[in-house]
Amino acid sequence: MHKVQFADVHFNAENTPVSAQFDDVYFSNQDGLAESHYIFQEGNQLWQRWQQTSEAHFVIAETGFGTGLNFFAVTQRFREFRLTYPDAPLKRLFFISFEKYPLPLAQLKRAHQAYPEFQSLAQQLQQSWLEPIVGCYRFHFAETTLDLWFGDMAENLPQLGDYMCNKIDAWFLDGFAPSKNPQMWQDTLYQHMYRYTKTQGTFSTFTAASAVRKGLIHAGFTVTKRKGYGKKRECLQGVKAQQQPADIHAPWALVQPAELTENADIALIGGGIASVFSALSLLERGAKVTVYCEDNSLAANASGNKQGAFYPQLSDDDLRYIRFYIHAFAYGKQRFNWAIEQGITFEHDFCGVALCAYDAKSAVKLAKISALQLPPSLYQPLSQQALSEQVGLPLPCDGGFIAQGAWLSPQQFVQNTFDFLATRGVIIKTQQKITALERQTTHWLLTTEQGDSFKHQVVVLANGHKLTQFRQTEHLPVYPVRGQVSEIATSTELSKLKAVICYDGYLTPKAASQTHCLGASHLRDNAERAFSLQEQQENQQKIQTNLASVDWVNEVDTRNNQARIGIRCSVRDRIPMLGNVPDFEQQLSDYHNLYNLRRRKHAIKHAALHPNLFLIGALGSRGLTSAPLLAETLASLIYHEPLPLSEDILHQLNANRSWIRKLLKGSQVKQG
């Protein structure tokens, strides 16, 4: 796992932060804010362009986040723009920034003291600051969204990927001076900038170095000099004047935004955790959202448990998936905290999650996690005694502890968040089973079991294990997984439990109902909802076998036969599916010879997709952790916005991945 190294920072006589890595100041000793405004805002003519654009959002990318000064300044300026021109088409600002060496929190706070006018923004950033791993973290600042990419920009910038071709409006070409940081100021940087910049998109920078100017010109930009700030004689600005076709490297995996009109009308099919987070993210973008749920009530299936564990999946041989779950976990915490701040009530406790090395196989798995050397705030290997102290009960083994993990009530969260969203305009229709989708010229026609029809511009499928019930999705390789969660009464000993325990199952601390959740069975290709005495007994046997040498497990008693059955949606590689619904037949026709087309470097068509039809599914048993970030990514895709995921992860989430993998190898894919 690529750890991110914090910056080595000291403060000079003017109290300006100085990087030891680059022996350079983070901003001007004289007036860093005025310099930022002159170089980047005036250099890119932001105020004028914001007034003139007909787009709903504007995208800025920055090389070097530093203290966040440029971000604070442009966020404040954009708020002034929105107040001055409330009826302008432009509603949202996206700020993408790259940082190899983030400041430690203490130094970040000290640097922010120089700019009290940004106190509110600075405090919000400080509260969100973390010990990051490589990749993208998304943060919301009202109408401005910050995508902060930690790690080496040479690795991260290409991960904006095919999707971001021709999408960036303006670049803040910042970072330490070229003479101090030559690794960044390379031709590859300018080439990526050009690839991602819109026609008539711009850049500005404080430097006028000849090598930088020549590199930008060679990449394709029209470059001009203007007066530098303060004592500096000159600085550079430029524009991508020529229209260029998108440079697409993996057309078979290219995702496509929706074709939207103003006040987009979007249908969400499903009433669980994926649906509620999708509704939230879409509503924030101004969509008219209608939710169709076939059950009598919301959260009636896999999202209906009384307690569920919230923590990242850290045990995988593919580091991409670990990165995904760590970023999803960080974003999920933001979303759950947002719900708490809004007064949405749901039982929860950020009590931590203990992972037990209960046998040889699990010990190897936890050893692999320890070898990742994750930040202790995320994961800490602990001895038997230390782990026992964290959970409040003796454990028979060593393990690991995720201090920021939690349990919460999925059922309460989903139902009460939908109630909240309904007060904000989301329309919720229960007992409405959609049985067919038909594409019309400008919309989708949804037909219900009762024979009613509804029209919507965009449809999002978030209906769990019933994802494949439509003609357009019947080829997706997902399957149902039955899970029975036992609800057991607490006891004198069990009531001492103060963290979630995971073994070959899990046990939660007691809820307000004085019960614990003990989970869970896992039966593939089984969608039965009836109570199973055998599974109830097996849930008890698992904990008493895995943690056999401690007495308190004998107080775990499932004989009350209280349980809840949910049907999860999963897929063989256990990775969620997200994005466009692929046109299976057309893709097989277009890509039957994909292996040779690629080998011979022939032109390859973009992946055939069902227009304005999207999905979020196959969340398995990790929906509490993955759904918030997946839903936010989906809403960003629908609205043609930057995505908070690296391309290597996004490709793995693509719903066509199973047959594309085969076709890329030259293997045959069966139809039907």
From Swiss-Prot:
Sorted UniProt keywords: Cytoplasm, FAD, Flavoprotein, Methyltransferase, Multifunctional enzyme, Oxidoreductase, S-adenosyl-L-methionine, Transferase, tRNA processing
Pfam families in alphabetical order: DAO (PF01266), Methyltransf_30 (PF05430)
Region forming the signal peptide: none
NCBIfam families for this protein: MnmC_Cterm (TIGR03197), PRK01747.1-2 (NF002481), PRK01747.1-5 (NF002484), tRNA_MNMC2 (NF033855)
Function field: Catalyzes the last two steps in the biosynthesis of 5-methylaminomethyl-2-thiouridine (mnm(5)s(2)U) at the wobble position (U34) in tRNA. Catalyzes the FAD-dependent demodification of cmnm(5)s(2)U34 to nm(5)s(2)U34, followed by the transfer of a methyl group from S-adenosyl-L-methionine to nm(5)s(2)U34, to form mnm(5)s(2)U34.
Family statement: In the N-terminal section; belongs to the methyltransferase superfamily. tRNA (mnm(5)s(2)U34)-methyltransferase family.
Record's protein name: tRNA 5-methylaminomethyl-2-thiouridine biosynthesis bifunctional protein MnmC
